Regions:
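Acidic, His- and aromatic-enriched active-site or binding-groove loops in soluble protein domains
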Residues: 54-58, 120-142, 164-168
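Residues at alpha-helix termini
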Residues: 89, 93, 134, 160-164
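Catalytic domains of cell-wall/extracellular-matrix polysaccharide-remodeling enzymes
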Residues: 145-182
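Terminal accessory/targeting
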Residues: 1-120
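Conserved radical SAM core fold
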Residues: 107-112, 139-148
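Generic structural signal for well-ordered alpha-helices
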Residues: 2, 80-88, 125-130, 154-159
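Conserved, mostly hydrophobic/aromatic
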Residues: 37, 142, 172
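Short alpha-helix boundary/capping motifs
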Residues: 77, 122, 176-178
Length: 182
């Protein structure tokens, strides 16, 4: 910041920049937030995944069936138990209260960018929610693309997630800033 201000003052012909005192900022983190977006909690799960694997990915019917209806723990996208163990190790190494884990859930939407659609109370997302409760993870709102295109729907989506989680939400994340003005 000092070099930026100094350069600006030098360009304007003023040499007053040396009188500006910048406070020294200690180089340490106040808090560490370990965040995970629950965008796609599974690779294959259910009937739609069966058809996707068979039709779009040209897998054999038997292979597609096995992928779609296997245990979630053997799905390569369902890695939350491992992540939470790693997070726990990080939390142990930091002072108490300086580190927390957050899961950001989406709400169902009609936009293709928001797929797959899921509710926290059903299927694989419910399993993620149970892990969050078991490990003391704070759950938060991941604003979907539909919220960018129709900001008036964000409040409804937030209430839907709060209803599903049965608690109020205090954190939100938004990835689609390029789509609309923040």
């Amino acid at each position: 910041l000092r070099s930026l201000l100094g350069g600006g003052f030098r360009e304007s012909g003023q040499e007053e920049y040396s009188k500006i005192e910048m406070p020294s900022i200690p180089r340490k983190f106040a808090r560490v937030h370990l965040t995970h977006d629950i965008d796609c909690p599974y690779e294959y799960h259910g009937v739609r995944s069966l058809f996707r694997a068979y039709v779009k990915e040209h897998k054999s019917l038997w292979n597609a069936y096995q992928l779609a209806f296997r245990s979630l723990l053997s799905d390569r996208y369902f890695t939350f138990d491992r992540f939470l163990e790693w997070n726990r190790e990080v939390e142990r190494r930091l002072p108490k209260g300086k580190c927390k884990t957050l899961f950001f859930y989406k709400t169902p939407s009609k936009e293709p960018e928001d797929r797959p659609n899921y509710r926290v109370t059903h299927g694989a997302a419910r399993r993620v929610h149970l892990y969050a409760r078991k490990y003391g993870v704070e759950e938060a709102f991941h604003i979907p693309m539909e919220g960018s295109l129709h900001p008036e729907r964000i409040e409804h989506q937030l209430h839907l997630l709060e209803h599903d989680l049965k608690k109020s939400i205090t954190h939100a994340r938004y990835h689609y800033l390029a789509a609309r003005e923040p």
